[in-house]
UniProtKB/Swiss-Prot annotation:
Chain segments carrying region NBD2: 591-803
GO function terms (MF aspect): ATP binding; ATP hydrolysis activity
Residue segments, region Repeat 1: 18-81
Region of interest (NBD1), ranges: 191-376
Identification of the protein by name: Chaperone protein ClpB 2
Gene: clpB2
CDD domains assigned to the protein according to its UniProt record, in alphabetical order: AAA (cd00009), RecA-like_ClpB_Hsp104-like (cd19499)
Organism: Parasynechococcus marenigrum (strain WH8102)
Amino acid sequence: MTGTPASRGSLTHEPDRFSDPAWELLLAGQDMARRWRHDQLDVEHLIQVLFSDSSFRRWVEPLPLRSDDLLDRLEDVLADQPPARGDQLFIGEDLEQLLETADQVRGRWGDRSIDVPQLIVAVGADPRIGAELFAAQGLAVDRLESLLRQPSVSPAPAPPPVPTAASAPAPTPRSAPAPRVMAPEPEPMVELEREPSALEAYGRDLTEEAEAGSLDPVIGRDSEIRNLIKVLSRRSKNNPVLIGEPGVGKTAIAELLAQRIVAGEVPDSLQGLRLIALDLGALIAGAKFRGQFEERLRSVLEEVSRSDSGVVLFIDELHTVVGSDRSSTDAGSLLKPALARGDLRCIGATTPEEYRRTVEKDPALNRRFQQVLIREPDLELSLEILRGLRERYELHHGVTITDEAIQTANRLADRYISDRCLPDKAIDLIDEAAAQLKIEVTSKPQVVEEAEADLRRVELALLAAEEAPEEERIQLQRQRLEVSSRLDDLRRRWQEERTQLEELGQLLQQDEDLRHAIAEAEREGALEEAARLQYDQLHTVQQRREALEASQAEAQSAGTALLREQVEAGDIADLVARWTGIPVQRLLAGERRKLLALESHLSERVIGQVEAVAAVAAAIRRARAGMKDPRRPVGSFLFLGPTGVGKTELAKALATSLFDEEEALVRLDMSEFMERNASARLIGAPPGYVGYEEGGQLTEAVRRRPYAVLLLDEVEKAHPDVFNLLLQVLDDGRLTDSQGLTVDFRHTVVVMTSNLASPVILEHARSGSSDDAQLQQQVDAALSSQFRPEFLNRIDEVIRFRPLKVKDLVRIVRLQLADLSTLMAEQGLSLEVDDAVADSLARQGHEPEYGARPLRRVLRRQLENPLATQLLEERFRSAHGIRVRCGTDDGASLEFEPLE
């Protein structure tokens, strides 16, 4: 059996030839064919609808047929048919013949249109399947026709007897049709469902959604919407394309245009327009054969051009349509003729990068569009947008969002989330914080769970005390009564607060519905109705809402509330901390105090470098106070000095002080980048080379953690090409990797260490000279011989580290001994060390040219190794501590005594 598309002469192209029930039967058969995933509508689909659909079963119930047996046989036939290979539905040849037979039956019966009984008779006459199914149950076509065509009797006082099939009269000539009654009488039919148009199937009517009030309010953006309206009002090139980074509000501007069209706040040339957003998911989904995607897009464009009411097509993510490459024909070739003829008015939206990649490479398509740049809003405008959206998110989540939370989200999103744009990233913060609070509100409060645990504990104790003294049991029973009473009170308060929150959510919804009804009444000119809604119902709702919010605020301030219904600044800070790994909670409240005490925090770990610590702290404070170029890193430092004097340790301490964890230190050993080709690893391998998709070691590390201390250790060993890359980082605070992605270094502290000029610094320290100017000249000469001037000029501070003295090493020894005491305390032993021990170890480890590293070896050799041996020998088994003192012979060796 083959299927062909319905021809021009097919009865399916003449719906007027059918009655409403008969046409609905054909439509239901079409749905049945799609349900079976068949690409051909045929007789068996109509039969299954007749016997399985309650809307049509009344037509066949009087017939002597067993529906279950017939449907079982029919499902076997339908299951054997192959599945569809495309989206088109064909009309089977057998169904075409059935419709012709039904038309002949209509002619014999003298009816004006084909009705369901004629279709059933034609099914019984179908030679392939219908006649077989009916004949298997003893129902021939002649009897079928006689059952369905029963004449009525002239009006009489009493109803006539129902004629049998044997007494049915012969067919009446067409010229004199006899009146008849079809059994059973169908119920009144509803209006037939029609197939959705291309715009309905593949688009969203934004103006309809704006009229229904389902679009979010759009605040500000006056200049952008004016530019958009000006381009749409032009005679030619009236197709704007909104170009902006992700999250700046391109789609929101299109929604704002729809809202202004509905409100009548557009020029006369745009009044009454429909703004349809193209649904790319529906347009592309299922287009698995060549040309299907373009065919769907062409049907949309044709319907837009035929529209009398005026349609503007909004194509969000324009590059996915133009650069879809779904087949050999680019969709841009379909847009260009329609745009050139003026049949299509289109608003596109895309990012600058995608616009360059897809649209600008086609000059013919590019000149059809007029660019409208959408820039990221500043903090002030972003704050206004967030405040305008507050009610929508409060309504959705059923919680209250404080203004402090909105300001915090706006500020922290701008400062700590650098890979996205405002207001989108701030909206995400508010949305997720509100969702998290909603989950907490709907969950059981912790105080209730603790009371339930206390009750279970007391009840278990009471069960275990069956043989205990009577006084103890009475005490436990009294405790159970107290805990149970407290738990009942907590549960009652919890339920009351939940009821209040639910009522508040309902009031928020009523407030939103009333505002929409007022706006609609004002648009329609029903000013009395609008006034009644505003000053009667809305006023009542707002009064009740204010009373509930005041009651909840009072309970919160008194500390008696079990549930928290307000999103606060701390919630936003917690969320930013989880997203970025930055301890924003501490920065939120105590950053000023921390910055003012930065020297003391750094000096606890970095010993003997007072000048270096002070210089770093001053530079960080200047940056945090806003006295630096906002495009540059927080600070850039070059640490110079001998090895082991604390250069790397200061970078670690800085990471801990600023970001509360040493993991915020991104460390790169620049000795790994001594060769020219190795420098490419910082930003990633070029296209075509191994490792291109992995990204660069420097750019990927900073992209994952933009708030960090970047330590470039032994920077003088790097290839000169590395410094060319660092120029952009130090000056512009950004670096573009091999994949074209820009990495932000504005929130990074760049620290470079070098051993350059170490001999000069050591010699100056040995000589005891106080001529610091001469030393500075020698250091500058050493730097100039290694680094180019443009690199040195971009560094904020070049900081010298002086060699360590014995008194500095004594302080370092005491820090190391404090760490060792902590380890010994875990074994239950205290550690007491004489002051002479620290002095002795410091003198033994003092080697100015090597810094503090020899001291680590002395500690290990003189203290840790012998102490470990004696611990394993269990010399201190009965002691509670160990005392360490210098030996009596030469003072260089140490002695260990147990403390009883």
